[in-house]
Amino acid sequence: LVVTDAFGEPIKVRTVAAMEIFAAKTNALISRAAARDLYDFCNMADMKLFSDAENMFRKCIIFYATISANKVNKNFDTSAIDSIAFSKIKSDLFPVLAVRDKFNLEGKKQQAKEYIASLMKPTEAEMDYMERFMAKEYKPELLFENTEIIERLRNHPMALWKCK
């Protein structure tokens, strides 16, 4: 929830949590390997945005991996990142940047792959969640311990649809 007075008086605006946005972006980077995803992901890593909440971040990445992909990449294989070519950086990324800093593509690829490899070591319960999800059995309680989160996710439309 963000409160802003940009329109002359304070109003509340519901927003998606940054962790959820970056969990979805991490999955996008792993699967579609777009230049913008690599740039955003590495900025997140450089800012150490979730360094104090890595377990929750991993769980969010796992959740988004299950609801967004046709086939769950439960090993979090990052080889698609290698396919990002500098021509895509020039055509897709540079036009949306205010300043065209030197962009070390190979260094950024390596940084992203190492961060993901370090973070994405699912626990036994998290692996069980993914296996069951692939078998069309949705059990958010295997992924999250917090009852409030579990209850909010229990009726997640995309998860329910994918498990039909």
Predicted regions and their residues:
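Structured mid-to-C-terminal alpha-helical surface segments
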Residues: 1-164
